[in-house]
Amino acid sequence: MNFINSLSAHLSDWVLRLASVCLAALGLVVIYGVVMRYAFNDAPPYVEQVALLLVISVAMFGAASGVHDAGHIGLDSAVKLLPAKGQFWCLVVVEILTITFAAVLLYGCEHMAASTRHDTIPTLGISEAWRYVPPMIAGVLIILFSVKHMLALFTKKTPA
């Protein structure tokens, strides 16, 4: 279990840093686009598409890191009223639902990437499939982090 905790902590740290870099790049790209449009009346055509890819990356990588830290939104007021065994099984159901969501996300993005891999984003000259890479990476990480949480639940260890 220590190996899994260590691996997931490193992956979460890595993906959070990647999200931070994407967020900083997003800010720079948007500022560049605004300055070019309004100060020089010469809007670069690629800014919107780069910004879209960066927004997707920030959201997906941030979500994966949030799942690792158990920082996702939880409405647990009613769950806290349950006995310990009921709380345990509610947590298990949450992890199962999270894994299911991530698996569907991964499957859907893989399908969309495969069906759009020959299409090109005109202003960037890259495949449309690249739009689906960050959600696929996030899907794999969310599954890994949720499995780690479930293992911790069943072995009575607090996830790191």
Residue ranges: model-predicted function:
Residues M1-A160:
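Alpha-helical transmembrane segments and membrane-interface helix-loop junctions
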